[in-house]
Amino acid sequence: MMVMNPLTATFLAALIGTAASASCGSSGIPFRFEVLPSGQPVLGCGSPTCFGAENGGRDLRHDSSFMAGADGDDGFFRDGDLARVRVRDPDAPAQMANCPREFSSSSCSNPMTWVGGFKASDNGDLSLQCCHYEGLRFAQEVGRPVVHPGEVYSGGEVLRDGRQTGFDAISNVRKITSGDGTVAYEVTVTRMNCLPNPGEESNEVSFDIQRDIGRILDKVGETAASGVQTNHIEADQRLSPSTDVQSDSYVSPTEADPQEPVEQFVQVGEQVVPVTSAGYYYPVASGVPACFTGNSKVMTPAGEKSMADLSVGDMVMTYEYGKMTYTRVASWLHRLPDTKAAFIKLTTEQGAIIDMTPQHFIYKANCVTEEMELVYAEDMTIGDCLMVKENEKLVMTTISEKSTFYETGVYAPMTETGDLIVDDVYASCHNVVKANTLSHTFLNFATSVQQKMRSVLGSLEETGHLPATSEFFLNIIDVLLPHKY
């Protein structure tokens, strides 16, 4: 029998009796908020390529802090973020947050702040650490998901056409208590500009400034003369994620009364790119994860089950090695029953119908060779081919209809094989990130390590969510690997 040192026991007792506190520090941004089944909140922090350093990107502060409890740490920092090399000009301003030492705020309502940390009491009340960052000056709120016990919200890097353009941070957290005493948290998500630093310290540029400016002005003149439509931006006109957007984004100025001249923005050097499908508006990564609906159906050995009723450890049908088989649900990427999102509905000629968010991956089949590739659901068009289940095999069918709708409840299970059959359609578990084999190798390793750590710490409770290290890996792998491989 192991006897604990009295000093160690006293120290552990002091920790247990102290309110849990988590802080991302001045080099971290809060991007993930999880509520364990026990009610303990967990804060996830990251330091993207556009943030975290001072003195030309050379110095980062390792001042984040987290506290261990019965259910594990109350926060974490993404592995590798603070070790990443940042290439910036030596005179570049610091990209760090100014965080107070105290956790004394009940709300981070200042638009220039985010929730750098929190101190949680036993009843779920949070005392917030509101960190100020100048880079939030042009940020915009994009959503307010509600996270209940056993659920998780994850923001982070925002990619458009494979390029990082922003970062979704948690700017405020508000406790919500229902009539039956259940505690949940409303998370305010703010999107800030987050362009990655260049890959090199310097590059050659032309020094003929007059010639270059002249070429740009000539290009603007040619564009205007050729009748290219420009967008008129009126004062105080803003589009929010909930704004209805038509397929034509041109705003015609009213002709009733003379108004002040409006400013014209002309994009020089790039072609005008039309909307993929007229009539659709997808709030791309607008603080809402890529997932399936709660009504989506999967097949288990015991019969059909809806996504909302699925649990970690369940066996679901997939297609592997040329035949139908079952794979285990290893974790949840996202499980947010109260979050509203835009979904795409794909109807096939065979009769199968699948609903998923625009940036969830699905297997598109070559209609001639049946060779499959992963593409975003939003990139599928009428006439494209999908693989659907028929008896005990996959057969090819074409998409006959495509529509969009809004629904509450988003679910993204992660299986051990990385794919599954949803509503008889062969689909991927992944969103934003395609890499299947590599990410699952890492996922299995990280899950194994986490389980061993729990057994050492004496906590056997399974939260059913993606391990922190895997969350980081899945968020950045699209940057590390080419899109075609």
Swiss-Prot record:
Site, as annotated: Cleavage: A290, C291
Biological processes annotated in GO: cell-cell signaling; intein-mediated protein splicing; nematode male tail mating organ morphogenesis; protein autoprocessing; segment polarity determination
Keyword field: Autocatalytic cleavage, Cell membrane, Developmental protein, Hydrolase, Membrane, Protease, Secreted, Signal
Site (Involved in auto-cleavage): T357
InterPro entries assigned: Dev_Signal_Hedgehog-like, Hedgehog, Hedgehog_Hint, Hint_dom_C, Hint_dom_N, Hint_dom_sf, Intein_N
Record region (Disordered): 236-258
Compositional bias annotation for Polar residues: 239-252
Function noted in UniProt: Intercellular signal essential for a variety of patterning events during development.
Assigned protein family: Belongs to the hedgehog family.
PANTHER family for the chain: PROTEIN QUA-1-RELATED
Gene3D superfamilies hit by this protein: Hedgehog/Intein (Hint) domain
A molecular function GO annotation: peptidase activity
SMART domains listed in its UniProt record: HintC, HintN
Protein name: Warthog protein 1
PTM annotation: The C-terminal domain displays an autoproteolysis activity.
GO cellular component assignments: cell surface; extracellular matrix; extracellular region; plasma membrane
Residues under site feature: Essential for auto-cleavage: H360
Secretion signal, residue range per the UniProt entry: 1-21
